[in-house]
């Protein structure tokens, strides 16, 4: 008969296989992983290792915690089940209710102490990758021990927390545990939201060294707004979103009319959602209203606002906003990045025209975008725009059989 234990074993086997894969990768790339910088790829690997590699070790210490408590109260361990991602200590003994409570709690204490030990041992490592792994492993153990496992015990008829929160047997101890448990969760939530468990990624070792120097400078010069905003921008670009948001909110308390800060907030919101949300668009508009003047930043703010307008079906307004973004970049001596941005803006404005069935204007903008993509020598971009031409052709043909829009290559 298929049981819950069989299900746990299947999941454990799958997780172990992934853990072995990760270990092979880590062993093969050990030297490069320890070396600077902390890249986005290394962060992703460390995040996975904090689960697939650290959790099996934490499970062992969890079960060891139970066993030590059993022995401390004169009990006998008659079975020690360890399946990497789950375990069980079978024991016998004449316990008081308080001792039963502590035996159940000891497993969670073992997991938390293991997570704390990893962070403590790695916090001063010369390798930023190992420091980040320590942070994430500690974070995951807090989450697993104080949130996931209690919920697991509440849903299923097994688990330590059913004993820990047995108010009929240990009303005082269970009550104190509940208060401490909730306090820990509040602190965890606050520190997590503040970005305590985050670090930004960097593309090069030089960039990381510059960031480390910048971090020291910003701490020494809290009133230097340029330094603070540059620091926040690197945090955001390095996907330390909570840390960036915390710094931004602190910055805005002291500089409530900073256009650049609102632009950073807009970019941060868009990055977290992978799309331009209503909040991100509102921050972008606030940045423009607050006197944003640098052309590239003006273009960026308008582009975010226009993307949201287009998503909300406000085609005519989106066309106007995209036009303002294009105008801002056209006033510059364009760099390669500017040309990429312009091509994307023309393509986006073409889409806004197309949704309003303004096929002539849509064709002209798509022609501009395609020309820029060819000048850049970006074959992938050209291919994407060719697909847009096909869609435009299809829409135009449905609107009027007499009208045909051909791509530049036809």
Where do the model's predicted regions map?
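Hydrophobic transmembrane alpha-helices and their immediate loop junctions
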Residues: 1-230, 237, 242, 273, ...
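Single-residue signature of alpha-solenoid repeat helices
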Residues: 210, 244, 279-280, 318, ...
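Flexible helix-coil transition and linker loops at the boundaries of alpha-helical arrays
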Residues: 214-221, 249-254, 287-298, 328-339, ...
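Structural motif corresponding to the intra-repeat A-B loop/turn of tetratricopeptide repeats
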Residues: 238, 272-274, 312, 356, ...
